[in-house]
Structure formats: C-alpha cells, structure tokens
C-alpha cells in the first residue's frame, strides 16, 4: 500500500489493545530452505496460515545489519532533511497517512521502486550512496529468497515447471517494490493498556512479500478464526506473507494473510519488506495445473494492473478480492 506524507497526531490514529504476553503465537511455521522437506513445509504453511518464517536462507547477517544501520541513520535525520526525500507519490519518503482514503498509522517510511534486483535508476531516493549500496545488496539477497520460496511452492504443489510462479517476479517488467518502515516509540500511551496502530490490518495484493525486522516486536497476524496473535520477533530470519494474487493463482488453496503492526511504547521498530508482483499486463487466474477435474475457478480473471488500481482505490482493511470472486 502507499503511505503519503503528513503529520496527524496520535488522536487521529486508531488505538488497539496493547499486546498481552499470552498473545504471542508459538505456532508460526518455520521453513528451513536447505532441508529436503522445504517444499512440503512451505505448501503446508501457505494452506494453514498464509504465513511462515524462513531460516537457513543464505542472506549474510552482515548484509542485513548494514541495511538496518543505514536505515536507522536515515530516519534519525531531522524532519526537514527527511522531507527532502518526499513526498511519496508514490515513491520516496512519507509519514503517517496510508493510502488515499483516510487510513493512518504511527510510522514513517521509504517506498522504493525496483528494476530487476536493485533500486530503479529513476528512483533517486535515497540519495546517500552508502545507503543505496547497502539496500541494493540486501534487495539482491532477499529477492533470491523470494525466488527460492516460490520455486518450493511450485514443487510442493506438484507443478512440473519449477519457475511457474517465480518467473512472474523475475520476468522483465515485473512490478517489484521495496519498503522500509520505521515505527517510532509512542510513549504518550505508555501504561494505558492500549497501543497506537503502526500499520492497520490488511492483506498484501502482490504474490508474496518477504519481511525482516529488527528485534522489536509489533507484527500481528490474524488466524483463520479471526484471533489476532503476535509474531515473535527474529531479526535473523525472514517472514513470508501469501498475497492476494497468489491466493487467486492457487484458486484459494493458499490464503493471503491479514496482518497489522502495533507500535511499541518504548522501542523503535524498523522493518524491510520486499513485495514481489508480476508485470502489469500479467493476467491473474487459477493455474490450470492446480484445478482438479471439473473444478471451477473461484475468481474472475483480471490483470495485475487492474487489481493494483482497485487496491489503491480501497481502504486498507477492505476485502479487495471480493469484487473479483465469482458468485
């Protein structure tokens, strides 16, 4: 989603009950990408939760640490200095306002366009060469993780073509986006039993998103029964979300996961998210290989461009797929 620059106060941002220690979800699926059973584990996690943690992913700790330290340095600048990297229409620096329809959250961010496995040349933010180099090294690594995960999905689903899914994000013109989010501590609510919304509940419209954060918790996912649970933070691992488009490609076998971020009252949270989307003209419909004999598609066919435009017109928490579901 797009976050637009603006300075609304805390009282304009929705409040949530502060996470309780009992809300921590110990059942997050963990996939070891180097294990022989990775493909089956990925499919099982996508079917049950639409969400999982990836370990043994091959991205060096130093690569992740450098990107994080440079992001912290950027967000530590004065507000006028940060504002020179915005406003985000859609790319660049933004703060607080989420989307075009009134959603707000307690965060500031950088939204960046990608060409292949690096920042787009036309994307001049960030201007700092050291920050750009650190991000490009990180993006190259996390994109490889996304490709490996999607190849594991294909294998686990029994699709003969290994890159049936991953080719959608490696194709020329694929719509890849990278986001750096900073959730400052919100001390105004400390001790009141409630927390400010960092980023409101939503699903991601793309195929997959791959997230990594610092050691500060805040990410929550909704289980199938509607219960919200907190995801234990792990700065050495990646977390993968199934997106709406992948839900359609699998005809609902994989479910896009609803998630949100609750701002911490004491510590900053910094997160990096790679969003893997297909080319704008790519048609999105259930893969024929995944439809059983006589099984009908649950969705009307659409292009990624059509779905992306529909997403930008919606509120953050809207069920964007509803208008494409066959009745």
Curated annotation (Swiss-Prot):
Catalyzed reaction equations: gibberellin A1 + 2-oxoglutarate + O2 = gibberellin A8 + succinate + CO2
SUPFAM superfamilies: Clavaminate synthase-like
Expression triggers: Induced by gibberellin.
Textual note on the cofactor: Binds 1 Fe(2+) ion per subunit.
Residues noted as binding Fe cation in the record, renumbered to the chain: 202, 204, 259
Residues given in the record as 2-oxoglutarate binding sites: 183, 269, 271
GO biological process assignments: gibberellin catabolic process; gibberellin metabolic process; response to light stimulus
The protein's role, per its UniProt record: Catalyzes the 2-beta-hydroxylation of several biologically active gibberellins, leading to the homeostatic regulation of their endogenous level. Catabolism of gibberellins (GAs) plays a central role in plant development. In vitro, converts GA1, GA20, and GA29 to the corresponding 2-beta-hydroxylated products GA8, GA29-catabolite, respectively.
Family indicated by similarity: Belongs to the iron/ascorbate-dependent oxidoreductase family. GA2OX subfamily.
Name assigned to this protein: Gibberellin 2-beta-dioxygenase 3
